[in-house]
Amino acid sequence: MYDNKFSEDVGSFFRSPVREIFKRVDLNAIYSFAGGYPSADTFPLEEIRQTMSDVIGKYGGQAFQYGATQGVMQLRQAVAERYSVPVERVQITSSSQQGIDVCTRVLVDPGDVILTSSPSYLGALQSLRSYRADIRG
């Protein structure tokens, strides 16, 4: 009934293979590296707690506000200084997947041939498919 209301590109959206894996696996019964699901025991909770306390102590509620889309300026400046590049050329992303998606959006046109290894990172393949790349590998 509503199929004709969606954009033409909606057909390029695929179900997440990682989500499909998670549906079929009892994540408490195994240590699976298939979906990037580390053991909860490996998280440095005390260090995270202390870091959060330090950040809140220094920045208060401002730490939880939206920031610049290119990333927090202090972090961008530190990265620019470390790698001797102009700060205007530094983009901070919130995850590797966001970085892959931004790069794909900027660099890949529909129909561009992209050579990949097999197997490849599923998140990258999804991003490439959503921008209608011709994936070979």
Predicted regions mapped to residue ranges:
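Conserved core of the PLP fold type I
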Residues: 59-137
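N-terminal "arm"/small-domain region of PLP-dependent enzymes with the aminotransferase-like
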Residues: 1-65
